[in-house]
Amino acid sequence: MAEKRAEKRKFNTDSWEPKTQVGRMVKEGTISDISYIMDKGLPLLEPEIVDVLLPDLEEQVLDVKLVQRMHKSGRRARYRATVVVGNKNGYVGVGMGKSKEVGPAIRKAIAQAKLSLIKVRVGCGSWECGCGSPHSIPFTAKGTCGSVKVELLPAPRGVGLVAGNVAKAVLGLAGVKDAWTTTYGDTRTTYNFAEATFDALNNLNFVRCLPEQKAKLGLTEGRVL
């Protein structure tokens, strides 16, 4: 189950009362770029910060399931939603939310996905291409979550996203247009599959590159446009 949410209304900044110092700085206009928050390692504790700094963020519901747990009074059922958010231009996040109703579960998952937002490195790391434009990923990356392992490989321009529907949704909203993927484990667990793909994208940020290597790979972080 993967469906895009209806176009949301523009966020009203006037009705927002920030609870953190970063939130107050964003509302005052002191911080106007989300990359500044990430580069400085400032805590991102309010989803409204993302609403203000990334108004073009898109949301996609990957899965909604009814889960149960045993209690002394009997079985208790709740809905679990998995959501991915991204602007298709270098920023992506994955979140999960639980509630007794579907709507609140999805809203919790969206808020959690916004708080987990990361910058994505894009480039052209395929030896078959070498165009130097940011259409793929700059190098191979691996990610894990539970039993699921995902390996992302750079692909030449025009190949598209060779991946399962969940990984394709995460990569697409991150701004990656061409990539090969290899998966291991129980990929039927939607959240683990999405989180493993997200972890692989995040691991791209920990690879050190020389300036000449960055130029050759066309490596770009965050916004491309």
Curated annotation (Swiss-Prot):
GO cellular component: cytosolic small ribosomal subunit
Phylogenetic placement of the source organism: Archaea, Methanobacteriati, Methanobacteriota, Methanomada group, Methanococci
Molecular function, one GO term: structural constituent of ribosome
Entry-linked PANTHER family: 40S RIBOSOMAL PROTEIN S2, RIBOSOMAL S SUBUNIT
Gene: rps5
InterPro entries: Ribosomal_Su5_D2-typ_SF, Ribosomal_uS5, Ribosomal_uS5_arc, Ribosomal_uS5_C, Ribosomal_uS5_euk/arc, Ribosomal_uS5_N, Ribosomal_uS5_N_CS, Ribsml_uS5_D2-typ_fold_subgr
Protein family according to the UniProt entry: Belongs to the universal ribosomal protein uS5 family.
Start and end residues of each S5 DRBM domain: 57-120
Assembly: Part of the 30S ribosomal subunit. Contacts protein S4.
Domains: entry comment: The N-terminal domain interacts with the head of the 30S subunit; the C-terminal domain interacts with the body and contacts protein S4. The interaction surface between S4 and S5 is involved in control of translational fidelity.
Name listed for the protein in its UniProt record: Small ribosomal subunit protein uS5
Stated role: With S4 and S12 plays an important role in translational accuracy.
Keyword Signal: no
